[in-house]
Amino acid sequence: MKQIIQDLKKGDTILEEVPAPRVKYGSVLIQTTRTLVSLGTERMLVDFGKANFIQKAKQQPDKVKMVLDKVKTDGLRPTLEAVFNKLGQPLPLGYCNVGKVVEVGKGVTEYSVGDRVASNGHHAEYVCVPKNLVAKIPDNVTDEEAAFTVIGSIGLQGIRLLQPTFGETIVVVGLGLIGLVTAELLLANGCNVIGFDFDPNKVKIAKEKGIIAINPSEGTNQVKFVESYTNNIGADGVIITASNKSNEIISQSANMCRKRGRIILVGVIGLDISRADFFEKEITFQVSCSYGAGRYDEEYEQK
C-alpha cells in the first residue's frame, strides 16, 4: 500500500510503498477514503526534517538536555548512534483519516465491517487504529466533512477546559483551521467571539461565518479593541490557536482578559510569562492536550 512518510534526517516527504498493517487486538483495520492535511502540525514536522542538526537542536532544547544527560551516562558514541537511529526512522504523517472498516480485531464489539468511521489514522491506504480513537460517521455527514473530526476535537478540548457560558466574550488568537473551527464551536455555544489573525484571507473567512474578525496588521490594537468591545471590562476568556515563538501573544492575551479571566493554549507559542500580567487580574492559564481525556494514555488508547 502507499503511505506518506517524513524522513527526519534528510527532510524528504515521500510517498512510499509499504506493507499494509494487520489488525490488532482492540483495533480496527480501515481502508482510507479521505485524509485531511493539518497545515500547522504537519508543516512543522516537514520544516523540522529539513532543518540541519543545529537548527533541530534549537527547535527542541528539551531534547538536547536529554541527549547531554545520555552522553554523561552512556558516552558520546553510543549517544550519537542512538540519535542518528532515531532520526533515521521514517515518521508517518497525518492524523485526520476517514474510511471504511474492513476488519475488526478481537475485543472490539462497537464496530462492524463496512462501518464508515473517522479516526486519527495516518495518510495511508490502510490504517490500524485502536477502537477508542475511532468514531462512527452519521449517515448525513459526508466523508469530506468527517475528515475534520479530529481537528474539531482539538478545538473542542480547548473549549471544554475554558468552560464558557452563554453570552461570554471569548477571543480566539489565530484563525487557522483549528482556530476557525474553534470560533465556530464557540458561536454555537452562544458566545460572543472575537478573532485575530494577520492573514487577510483567514479574517475574511471568519467574518463570513459571523465572527468578529480583525487583522492587527491593518492598524487595530488588539487589546484596545477588546476593551472597547467589552466596555473596558475585558474578555471572559482567550483561546490561543496560533503557532508563533513570540512571547508577545501570551502577554497580549492576559491584557485582553478581565479580572479572573481564563486563557487556554491550544497552539504553540513562546511562554516566557510575565508575573505582572497575571498577578493583578488573577488570570488562569492552562495548556490543552491534543483532543482530550485519554490522549497519550496507553491504558485508554491501546487496551
Regions found by a protein language model. Give the residues of each.
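Short, well-ordered loop/turn sites that connect or cap secondary structure elements
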Residues: 111-112, 164, 257
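A structural motif shared across PLP-dependent enzymes of the aminotransferase-like
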Residues: 92-95, 120-132
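Glycine-rich cofactor phosphate-binding loops and adjacent beta1-alpha1 units
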Residues: 204, 209-288, 294
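Short N-terminal strand-loop motif that marks the start
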Residues: 1-85, 89, 121
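Residue-level marker of beta-strand positions
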Residues: 34, 115-116, 126, 169, ...
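Mid-domain Rossmann-like dinucleotide-binding core that forms the NAD(H)/NADP(H) cofactor-binding site
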Residues: 116, 145-219
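A glycine-/small-residue-rich N-terminal strand-loop-strand element
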Residues: 78-89, 96-120
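Conserved acidic E/D residue at the C-terminus of a beta-strand in Rossmann-like folds
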Residues: 121, 197-198, 289
